[in-house]
Amino acid sequence: MAELTSLTLKAALDGLSSKSFSSVELTQAHLEAVEAARALNAYVVETPDRALEMARAADARRARGEAGRLEGAPLGIKDLFCTEGVESTAASKILKGFKPTYESTVTANLWRDGAVMLGKLNMDEFAMGSSNETSAWGPVVNPWRAEGGNAQLTPGGSSGGSASAVAAELCLGATATDTGGSIRQPAAFTGTVGIKPTYGRCSRWGIVAFASSLDQAGPMARTVEDAAILLTSMSGHDPKDSTSLPVETPDFASFCGKSVKGLRVGIPKEYRVDGMPPEIEKLWEQGIAWLKEAGCEIVEVSLPHTKYALPAYYIIAPAEASSNLARYDGMRFGLRVEGGNLTETYENTRAEGFGAEVKRRILIGTYVLSAGYYDAYYLKALKVRRRIADDFDRAWEKVDALLTPTAPSAAFALGEKSDDPVAMYLNDIFTVTVNLAGLPGMSVPAGVDANGLPLGLQLIGKALDEGTLFSLGSAIEKAADFKAKPKKWW
């Protein structure tokens, strides 16, 4: 059944509609792959019974001629999405045993279209991390290994489980979320495609909040077209989320393979940072050449406030997190550690329930919001955020999209940066600006480094113009012809 798991989502949907195989067969093949790949620690909850039940229902609907857009396709769900009756912990001990009584809007949209749930995917605790090492359930392992090496590598974060599962063929696609790069950086580290859509394109209702003004759901998949198919289902206006945009959802897959001739693509000069590995620089130049060959006009642009993006992000995101995470007090759900009085119970619960990185960010966030520092840090960061958005607005007067690297390196070894939070935070250097400005950003696998590890290129688009990114992404995908797969060791 291995060949069923190596299909793209599009090929699997075609096979289901031509009755080459059933959803039950497809789902069973994936469940076996998931079971055999537990060494990757990609799934924190496996739901085989529910998956087969959903697959049988999908086959029945297809037989009645009522097939939805994703009918019978087995997917993995990041553990940040609430799934009714299935444990949803955001990879935190403080939510151990929490089974939501409702379904997140994004997952409800997928089930409406006939998708099948294989289980919940591991991630950094509360989506705070860039290496999937902050999970209370242990790190996720990247299915890729450096040539000639057997060190375990990070799949990136926070959507490391999603990235690892898609790359190791443990699902046809996965949901993920991106607050500062958590879809795009893991996609680059695992040779997969990930898109963070425009802020408000996908509903945040039922997604455990990290930084509410930055969080956005998106898909991870093995091809640009697969990501487009998933995003079409995930998107849509939701009155339950006040930041959800009341706009129509286009058929994103229709943009894949469209001519990009005449599109103007900007190259931000500030992204040529000191110490960028020559391989990343070379890949970027290669990407520029591919788009030129496809008929794009290349224009150098300036985003002068780029250098302030990381500091602004690491003030705004923790500030919002410190407010959002105040709801975890052991009273109504999740972990409770009793104390002598109410305050002590709060303290004991949080001391035991939150991991070190989450505590660090709550402390930073509480500090920058405190009297005397609010103006110096938080308000200043908000002003910088506005400037960053203005930089992009000026760039859009000249260009239709931007091309940059996704991450400053290929995947690194687990444990390599865990003692140095600043080195870890630098992983987001090319991605955070996109969240601060609320724009769509996509990572496409474009090559490998000297050790045979995947590298990605990032495309950034105008608000609500994901279509152009899918067209440019499929042009890069076609030119790069990235066929490399991780050699199976698990």
Curated annotation (Swiss-Prot):
Active site: K78 (charge relay system), S158 (charge relay system), S182 (acyl-ester intermediate)
GO terms assigned for molecular function: ATP binding; glutaminyl-tRNA synthase (glutamine-hydrolyzing) activity
Keywords of the record: ATP-binding, Ligase, Nucleotide-binding, Protein biosynthesis
Top-level division of the source organism's lineage: Bacteria
The protein's Enzyme Commission number: 6.3.5.7
GO terms of biological process kind: translation
Matches recorded under NCBIfam families: gatA
UniProt record similarity statement: Belongs to the amidase family. GatA subfamily.
Protein function: Allows the formation of correctly charged Gln-tRNA(Gln) through the transamidation of misacylated Glu-tRNA(Gln) in organisms which lack glutaminyl-tRNA synthetase. The reaction takes place in the presence of glutamine and ATP through an activated gamma-phospho-Glu-tRNA(Gln).
Protein name, UniProt field: Glutamyl-tRNA(Gln) amidotransferase subunit A
Native species: Phenylobacterium zucineum (strain HLK1)
